Each structure stands twice: as C-alpha cells, then as structure tokens.
Amino acid sequence: MGIAKDILHIFEPNPLACGQAVLAMLTGNDVQKVIEEVGTERETTLLQMRNFLESKGISMGKCRKPVSDKNELPQFAVLSLETPKCWHWSLYADGRFYDPEYGVLEDFPPSARRYYWEVKSI
C-alpha cells in the first residue's frame, strides 16, 4: 500500500485522536477505520503508530530527531510536537504541514519542542 499518492487533510475526530488522523492522512484510509485498527480513539503511542504504518507498507525511522526549521525535514515525516496543551502528532508532507488540529499550514503549528521520524513507503 505505502504512502498515499495525494495527502488529504483530516481533522482529528476528537481532541485525543491526532495520531489516528495522521495515520489516516498518510495512508489514505478513513480515520474511523484507523481508530478500529489501532484499537483506541484516544492517545496513540509511538509503538501503535509504528505498527500501524508497517502493516500498511510504510517504514518509520527508528530514531526521533529534533527539528527547528522546516528545511531540515525530509519529504515525509511524522512529527511529535509539544504544543501549549499537550504532546501532539502532526504530519509533514511535500513542504506542507497537515495538522489534525490546525489544518494545512506552511510552517509548524504552535509548539515549543519538535521532533520527527522520517517515513517512507517500503
């Protein structure tokens, strides 16, 4: 399957489902289907994110990397961001940020600390 050919933005269906929305955008799946497959509509762990992506033919880098500028990011990346409210999953794809809470952005959503894992189709 691999990474979706066209990334379409999806808002998180509830304030705790940012990870599921990122997985849905990255794979082109329906977010409710992702929730069922991941097994929770609440916060997702790194392991849940990685396992879901691998089951869809997408590899996720083994190490998280700090990032401060969008020019440091690879073509596709899953982001972990420390936002004013909580830690938050987001997606970077082809020069744009697809954030489950804030929408499609040209730069990072509001965040103090930022990390990423590169993702690639296997």
Task: Give the ranges of each region predicted by the language model.
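Active-site nucleophile-adjacent alpha helix/oxyanion-hole segment immediately C-terminal to the catalytic cysteine
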Residues: M1-I58
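Noncatalytic regulatory segments and standalone regulatory/sensor domains
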Residues: F97-I122
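Short glycine-aromatic motifs
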Residues: I58, R64, A112-R114
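General structural signal for secondary-structure boundaries
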Residues: D30, T45-Q48, P66-D69, E106-P109
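Extracellular and analogous surface-interaction loops
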Residues: L26-T27, S68-K70, K120-S121
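Active-site-adjacent substructure of cysteine-protease-like catalytic cores
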Residues: I35, G61-A93, E101-Y102
